[in-house]
Amino acid sequence: MAKEKYDRSKPHVNIGTIGHVDHGKTTLTAAITTVLARRLPSSVNQPKDYASIDAAPEERERGITINTAHVEYETEKRHYAHIDAPGHADYVKNMITGAAQMDGAILVVASTDGPMPQTREHILLSRQVGVKHLIVFMNKVDLVDDEELLELVEMEIRDLLSEYDFPGDDLPVIQGSALKALEGDSKYEDIVMELMNTVDEYIPEPERDTDKPLLLPVEDVFSITGRGTVASGRIDRGTVRVNDEIEIVGLQEEKSKAVVTGVEMFRKQLDEGLAGDNVGVLLRGVQRDEIERGQVISKPGSINPHTKFKGEVYILTKEEGGRHTPFFDNYRPQFYFRTTDVTGSIKLPEGTEMVMPGDNVTIDVELIHPIAVEQGTTFSIREGGRTVGSGMVTEIEA
């Protein structure tokens, strides 16, 4: 049978299941794939059972071992990539490293338990790493006979979401049973379809990478006699065209401007380079020694150099190749942003004396050189070239 071509006509959205251990995230993931395969059969909609999702392979993302299951499915309107991570630590790592970029998530809460500690932690992490849209699935409602109890649990979840600045009063809450839907109970299958309609409607289509402002991390710089300076790298987002005015940002207090006079890929001239392309960009108005690896080429005004920010970080365990000992306030490692290391110092939150390998924590960082950063920029924490942590910028301070 010929391989079917990947259909790009439907908008693509990344989502995931989050919530406390044993509340039914993986069962719900299995139920979504199974019910869609029954109701909307297609080459994409294949049922996945609990065991195959639960046996997620280990992946290494920036030196960190993460177990994550990736499944895909489609509704009539959209194509989805769905991530489900079996263990709590896998979620924390996934979200902080940006390994799993979710446009929205389904928060699974067992009606029998209500919100639990990891429910709270996953909501906080979603807020920190910029997952803006959550939908609640109250699972296991078949095990609760008391309507009032269900109402109380729903109120509790809504209050918790509001506490972390989500629209707790307004966001959708769907009550169902993932297990019953998986077993083929049509009442509960209907609820899974209702959940997917809600996901279609409530989670907005993400802005495509090519529509965002240009960001090109500089990896290499050389000069071509008689033509000027070339900076090369992989375009992170946006597009670059001949005659564009750009800014060079980072490692200096001031930004400098230049004009693009050529774009090349694989030694061929292009009219434009797009997000994902490895390009060389010929620049007018900049000398070979005025641009270096670690800076970024960006759309003017879109990103600025900063030295102080708050970050949410995960510190690797000894087994992952991280530190064997805790670190304390004013720890000074290197922060690796995109293509370069910059030394910085860490201030720990009030009341936190030390950070152990395997912990996640919110830190204040001050770098010795400014770097082009914004909310959502990811980084690694390194010591002598060895990764000891991974994080994401949550707030710019200076």
Curated annotation (Swiss-Prot):
Domain tr-type G, chain residue ranges per copy: 10-207
EC number per UniProt: 3.6.5.3
Region (G1): 19-26
Gene: tuf
Region (G5): 177-179
Region of interest: G4: 139-142
Family that this chain belongs to: Belongs to the TRAFAC class translation factor GTPase superfamily. Classic translation factor GTPase family. EF-Tu/EF-1A subfamily.
UniProtKB keywords: Cytoplasm, Elongation factor, GTP-binding, Hydrolase, Magnesium, Metal-binding, Nucleotide-binding, Protein biosynthesis
Protein name: Elongation factor Tu
Known catalytic reactions: GTP + H2O = GDP + phosphate + H(+)
Native source organism of the sequence: Streptococcus suis (strain 05ZYH33)
